[in-house]
């Protein structure tokens, strides 16, 4: 039996890694999101039951759970040098002349590649397994970011050959992900990233790998730093990297001379704005590897390669009007409507104005002559006003008092920059809200990923979270990616979600400032969700850890007629809106527990919820105040610390006895044994 399980886990690991490669590297998926989710879920469950069979290249090992205190230093096996820059055709030809003098021949090729604007890293593999990854740092010493790099799905954890190799790549954030991230940060009043490079660097250097995983970074591998295999040319090396399973820079060109190389650079510049990732130039490299050794390098840069940098571009134009757009979380964003102007190869007729404070600070008015540039070469933005061309006919802009999409009230809290639509059913907000509603920490509807939600939303089958519970078999079965089996599975998952605890539903509603902890607090202090329609700010401020922003947000949300309508439809569909607090005992009130290792019958979250429902407190760290540590298979350092401190140890059998105890006295007896 155990050998069968081991083989099945290995089969799932290989299968999921294959589909990751097809999706993240080749951009050519072969299965639906739902089928992928089911494979992944099976693997997670098997690994939970049989932790001794967790393979190092398992896709579940991409996201670690531990938050680091800092990054260790790593000395690079081969220095990661930077490139010298050239800025025009003449300087490029000077580079070619110097290189020919250095190597004593003109009988060689160049390879021209994109200069990805990201963060350079080294990836080290031993016998085909990814063992270490580090940032460039100063070129000689970088930071160990192995766990964070594992979250990048285009980085293979196991190569297609059992080879030892060190490669260099550029981690970047795709343009669409950068835009999404900054929109989210703007809506949450967090500082914006200036460009995709900063976003990639900030994401990769997160101490918590789970945050890195959410940022959807990507990588292009562009060089072999060290390898057991002998290769003759750089082009050959790129093809070998592809063969091993790496994602390499697309559209590289082998050029016979510097003239062809410059033509290739011009073509790259022409299509720069059409690329899904950010580049700030092109790289020209000597193709013949043996001649690179002849050319050599300086302390900082190789003499056999150069970066051709593209210049930034700003243009003057007229601001014709200011249009207000509504984001997915309800924030109103002013957008400049411009007299069309060509910037960086594309016609720009709209540009961001960020927020009302930005407009006031820059004194931007409708009718002004303004300077526009592409922020990070992606997002057009108005950067300044040409005051010398102001005529006096310009108009001052003010934010609307009603949402331009749904007509609901627009509010602005005193301590915030953002203006917000309060409408629950505003179409501009609904899509993002639905994604949040179905997510794992909310209503946890299996198989309802982003592609499924997008399809249903675009078809008009769901406009609010409540619509999910009114979907019928005939609505789904003929849609793309659906069949009889997947339709039935999704409908079962939707049905199962109706019984989630009330705190899950409150969190799923996406109330501003109300996270999982606050949602649980609310659920513990009310009988049903109906109580929130009459609750006051004063009452909310009496709750543990509730501040003014949270109280105001809850009251505002539940005073909206659209909220009442949404809740009524959820109730009519059979979704649980009643608190479990009265049905639950408090036999473990005052006790504190810590969980470590894998339980065979319960996930970590399930065990935590059971204990909390009985009045217990569950913490992440062991101290002298801890009542007991519940230990599963393969426990961590918490088990050792509990033994050192003399804290009570409970196994899974003890845990089950404890949570089934009928009285506090019975629970105390179990804890005293």
UniProtKB/Swiss-Prot annotation:
Reaction(s) catalysed by this chain's protein: NAD(+) + (deoxyribonucleotide)n-3'-hydroxyl + 5'-phospho-(deoxyribonucleotide)m = (deoxyribonucleotide)n+m + AMP + beta-nicotinamide D-nucleotide
Residues engaged in binding NAD(+): 33-37, 82-83, 113, 136, 170, 285, 309
Single GO molecular function: metal ion binding
Binding locations of Zn(2+): 403, 406, 421, 426
GO CC annotation, single: cytosol
Keyword Cell membrane: no
Co-factor requirement: Mg(2+); Mn(2+)
A GO biological-process term: DNA repair
Coiled coil start-end: none
Catalytic residues of the enzyme: 115
Family, per entry: Belongs to the NAD-dependent DNA ligase family. LigA subfamily.
Protein name (database record): DNA ligase
Organism: Caldicellulosiruptor bescii (strain ATCC BAA-1888 / DSM 6725 / KCTC 15123 / Z-1320) (Anaerocellum thermophilum)
Chain's gene name: ligA
């Amino acid at each position: 039996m155990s050998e069968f399980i081991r083989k099945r886990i290995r089969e799932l690991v290989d299968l999921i890694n294959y589909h990751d490669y097809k999706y993240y590297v080749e951009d050519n998926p072969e299965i639906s999101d739902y089928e992928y989710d089911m494979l992944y879920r099976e693997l997670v469950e098997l690994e939970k039951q049989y932790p001794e069979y967790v393979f190092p290249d398992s896709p579940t090992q991409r996201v670690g759970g531990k938050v680091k205190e800092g990054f260790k230093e790593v000395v690079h096996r081969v220095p990661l040098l930077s490139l010298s820059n050239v800025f025009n055709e003449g300087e490029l030809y000077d580079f070619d002349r110097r290189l020919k003098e250095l190597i004593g021949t003109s009988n060689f090729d160049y390879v021209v590649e994109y200069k990805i604007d990201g963060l350079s890293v080294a990836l080290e593999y031993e016998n085909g397994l990814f063992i270490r990854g580090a940032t460039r740092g100063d070129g000689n010493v970088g930071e160990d970011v192995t766990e964070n790099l594992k979250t990048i799905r285009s980085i293979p954890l196991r190569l297609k050959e059992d080879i030892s190799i060190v490669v260099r790549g550029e981690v970047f954030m795709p343009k669409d992900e950068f835009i999404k991230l900054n929109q989210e940060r703007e809506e949450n009043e967090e500082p914006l990233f200036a460009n995709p490079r900063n976003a990639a660097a900030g994401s990769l250097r997160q101490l918590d790998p789970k945050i890195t995983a959410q940022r959807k970074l990507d990588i292009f591998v562009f060089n072999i730093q060290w390898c057991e295999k002998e290769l003759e040319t750089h082009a050959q090396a790129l093809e070998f990297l592809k063969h091993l399973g790496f994602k390499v820079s697309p559209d590289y060109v082998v050029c016979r001379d510097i003239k062809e190389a410059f033509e290739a650079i011009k073509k790259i510049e022409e299509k720069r704005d059409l690329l899904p990732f950010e580049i700030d130039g092109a790289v020209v490299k000597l193709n013949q590897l043996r001649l690179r050794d002849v050319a050599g390098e300086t302390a900082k840069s190789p003499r056999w390669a150069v970066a051709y940098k593209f210049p930034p571009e700003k243009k003057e134009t007229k601001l014709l009007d200011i249009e207000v757009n509504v984001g997915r979380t309800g924030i109103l964003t002013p957008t400049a409507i411009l007299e069309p102007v060509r910037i960086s190869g594309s016609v720009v007729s709209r540009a961001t104005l960020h927020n009302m404070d930005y407009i006031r600070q820059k004194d931007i008015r409708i009718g002004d002559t303004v300077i526009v540039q592409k922020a990070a070469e992606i997002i057009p933005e108005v950067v300044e006003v040409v005051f010398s061309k102001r005529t006096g006919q310009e108009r001052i802009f003010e934010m609307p008092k009603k949402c331009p999409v749904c007509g609901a009230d627009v509010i602005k809290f005193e301590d915030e920059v953002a203006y917000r639509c309060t409408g629950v059913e505003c179409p501009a907000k609904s899509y993002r809200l639905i994604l949040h509603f179905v997510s794992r920490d909310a209503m946890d509807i299996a198989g309802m990923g982003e592609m499924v939600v997008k399809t249903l939303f675009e078809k008009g089958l769901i406009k609010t979270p409540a619509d999910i519970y009114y979907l019928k078999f005939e609505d789904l079965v003929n849609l793309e990616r659906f069949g009889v089996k997947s339709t039935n599975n999704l409908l079962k998952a939707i049905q199962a979600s109706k019984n989630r605890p009330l705190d899950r539903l409150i969190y799923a509603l996406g109330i501003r400032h109300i996270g999982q902890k606050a949602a649980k607090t609310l659920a513990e202090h009310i009988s049903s969700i109906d109580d929130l329609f009459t609750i006051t700010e004063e009452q909310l401020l009496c709750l543990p850890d509730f501040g003014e922003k949270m109280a105001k947000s809850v009251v505002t949300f539940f005073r909206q007629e659209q909220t009442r309508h949404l809740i009524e439809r959820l109730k009519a569909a059979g979704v649980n809106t009643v608190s479990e607090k009265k049905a639950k005992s408090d036999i473990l009130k005052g006790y504190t527990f810590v969980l470590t290792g894998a339980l065979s019958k319960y996930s970590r979250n399930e065990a935590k919820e059971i204990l909390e429902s009985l009045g217990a407190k569950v913490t992440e760290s062991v101290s002298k105040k801890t009542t007991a540590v519940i230990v599963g298979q393969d426990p961590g350092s918490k088990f050792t610390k509990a033994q050192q401190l003399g804290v009570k140890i409970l196994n899974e059998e003890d845990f089950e006895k404890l949570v089934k105890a009928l009285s506090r006295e019975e629970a105390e007896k179990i804890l005293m044994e």
